[in-house]
Structures are given as C-alpha cells and as structure tokens.
Amino acid sequence: MSDLRVVLVGGDEALEEWRYVHNVVVPPAAMSFEEAGERLKRGYRLENVYDGDVLVGCSTVRPVVDGVVTLIARVLPEFRRRGFGAALYEHVLAYARVQGAEVVETCVLGVNEDGLRFARRYGFAEVERYVLDGESDEWVDLRLAL
C-alpha cells in the first residue's frame, strides 16, 4: 500500500467504479447503474478507494439513525491482505463517529470468509444469519458498539 486515496463518489464515472467493486465483491446483490445512483439519492455516502490510480475497493455508509450506522467496506479480492481494508474501515468508522454513531452494523455475504474474519477481528459480533425470500444466498448481519 503506497498511495491510498479515498474519494467521495461524484459523477457517473466514479459511480460506475463504485458499482463495479460492489458487484465483484457481492455478486448476488449486483446492481445496475440506476440502482447504484438510488443509493446516492437516499443519502448514502459512497466512496472509492485507490492505490495511486488503481481502484482497489469501495465503501458505503448509510445515514445514522437513532445512533446506529451501517457501514460496509469492500476490497477487490486481488488487493486483500495488503492493509487496504483496515485503512478503509478506519476511514469510514471515523466518519461515522463524527456523524454521531454509537453502534455500527455491517452485512457480509455468508460465503465471504475474508469479510467475516475481517469484521470479527475488529470486534463485530454476529447478530443474525438469513436468506432473503426467493433467494439462496446466506447473509450475515454483524454489530459493534462504539
């Protein structure tokens, strides 16, 4: 990790990059460009992460509600275990704290062992495992009190 940059999504090209990372990391929840844009309209903070000019990940921070924030940090598989996830997580966590978060929630695809291990390493506790109606993929909700 040499030149980490976290950049707020602004404009179509950045949104498409965010969507690309999201869809690679979470294929069962792959979304269209329009669906990604809806997240911005809902007030979600979307950011892309670069090592220099190379896209390595993205993040989502939902608005804080009643002291609870949902944040998700995603790193492309070929860039994992290099410190990008840790740096991104610290970045979004700092933002969430400034927004008044007292509790952090995240959601990880059940087969994403790297993501589950990462969340547990940072103190997240599993809250629930579930499969959405009409789907077959298992999701894991995790929570951390700040």
Predicted stretch roles:
Residues 22-60:
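Active-site rim helix/loop that mediates acceptor-substrate recognition in acyltransferases
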Residues 43-44, 56, 66, 70, ...:
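Short coil/loop residues immediately preceding or within conserved phosphate-binding loops
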Residues 81-94, 98, 117-121:
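Conserved acetyl-CoA-binding loop-helix of GNAT-fold acetyltransferases
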Residues 96-110:
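Conserved GNAT acetyl-CoA-binding A-motif
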